[in-house]
Amino acid sequence: MKVVHQRYVAHSEAHYAGNLVDGAFGLKLFGDAGTHLAITLDGHESLFAGYASVEFLAPVRGGDVVEAEARLASKGRRSRTVDFELRIICRSVDDSGRAEVLAEPIVATRARGTAVVPVEAATTAL
């Protein structure tokens, strides 16, 4: 099971030279997508326990459009291991406001994390 959120990256999110956005921006999107996945699976927002791994693979810039995917990797009694991927699907061409839809998405960030649901919210069906 998976959920995908898409979002425009405002230029105001860029804090570094080259119009770069910090990596925490993508991790916040992972949190939102992970919460959506947990609600879909268990009817509960869950609590995020932490990341086992995070890889920053390509820069995200102001003016990009990204999609954050949360995919269930495994399900325990109360724990949910989730694989995340942040992809850039549109890229700003220049500072004039022009942008293009990318022929192939650029994978910017990958991560794996664990969420936990309360006993009363845990379901047994996948």
Which positions does each model-derived feature cover?
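Hot-dog-fold acyl-thioester-processing enzymes
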Residues: 1-47, 108-110, 114-126
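HotDog/MaoC-like acyl-thioester-processing domains
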Residues: 61-62, 71-126
